[in-house]
Amino acid sequence: MSNTMPGRPMRLAGREVKGAAQLREIVDACQTVRIAAVDNEGVFIVPMSFGYDWADPAGLEGSEEPRLALWVHSTVEGRKVDVFDAEPRVAIEMDVQEGVITGNYACAYSYAYRSIVGTGTVHRIQSPEMKRYGLERIMAHLAPDALPGFTDQALARTKIYCIDIEKFTGKQRA
């Protein structure tokens, strides 16, 4: 399986995470996704809580790669809302920080991590049923023991977005 971003192989190929189960473990361990977007003011990046849907390749006819969709929420106005609605192409990054790797001299130090980097398309969710589903995915990921339920008033003042991740790679440094 290859989730390599189009056009460029990973420079340190030995650090690439290739298995669907290992990639999902990284996504599941992350609490925050950083979403990069571009508007007329320039490039910006915003950290967000997220939930996700995952489909393994075995369950996808004609696919050798897993499918990942991220669910995020926002208030009803602001720069992020404006750019997501105007320019849906985004890049994402999420990581699990594992700690400092010590060395015998300063340049031998490094950092252990596991990460996912990718690109996708943001879709604003309109229907109350799908907005509720998106919030449930976020809560299932971040607070699985929380009591379910969202009022119609909460749904009305919350924007929900689903980001279809089209290409992503996993990388780790132990």
Spans of features found by a protein language model:
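Charged, gly/pro-rich active-site loop segments
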Residues: 2-14, 97-174
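Short, basic/aromatic recognition patches
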Residues: 5-34
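A generic structural signal for nonpolar/aromatic side chains embedded in well-ordered alpha-helices
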Residues: 26-27, 83-84, 138
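Short beta-strand segments
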Residues: 30-76
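A generic structural signal for short beta-strands and their flanking turns/coil linkers
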Residues: 31-33, 46, 66-68, 86-90, ...
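Short, structured patches in soluble enzyme cores that scaffold and shape functional sites
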Residues: 37-39, 74, 94-96, 164-167
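Short, charge-rich binding segments
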Residues: 62-64, 81-86, 106-110
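Helix-adjacent hinge/juxtasegments
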Residues: 73-74, 79-100
